[in-house]
Amino acid sequence: MDEWSQKRDTMQHYNVVAKSYDELYANEQEAKIETALKKVGIPNNSLILDSGCGTGLLFEYVADKAKIVMGLDISRGLLEEAKKRAKSFGNVHLVLADADYTPFKDGVFSHVFAVTLLQNMPNPEKTLAELIRVAGKNAFLIVTGLKKRFSLDFLEGLLRKLKLNVIEIVDGDPLLKCYVAVCVKV
């Protein structure tokens, strides 16, 4: 299947499940977010990108601390749900876009989150390279990798290949179906 066909299928799937997404996946997503945030602080001047933001579950954890939170997703249905959550915050903005081709300048964000994104992308290396491009110097990148899709060695190798400083990859939590990698762009 070509790259765009895979992305289109993913987009259509999430458009269909958007209204029930939180009911189906919120507990699992929140466990990933909470694991990541135990490792990374969010200073008041933070500029955060939540790439593949889904329904915006991350917003409730970071928006009250950050200067700006940008939620990006390819699914209009998920963004409609995220919009409801974003209304509670004056600093959350949403963008309908492909995570491989974000509309942001180089080096903008202090924190880039990619929770449950890579397993949905046809070329995870390309996606990560784009996330690194928009991350500022010394920015944190928090990336999850579904264990059914990626081995720990593959994920760590990919992060290191792209010259990220891997601080930690959380693997041992039985509640998580994924690895949670905390990295810094150097």
Across the structure, where does each feature detected by a protein language model lie?
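Short alpha-helix
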Residues: R149-L162, Y179
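Conserved beta-strand signature within the Rossmann-like core of class I S-adenosyl-L-methionine
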Residues: N138-L146
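A short SAM/SAH-binding and catalytic strip from SAM-dependent methyltransferases
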Residues: H111-N123
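A short glycine-rich, Lys/Arg-flanked "PGG" loop and its adjoining helix->strand segment in the class I
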Residues: E125-K137
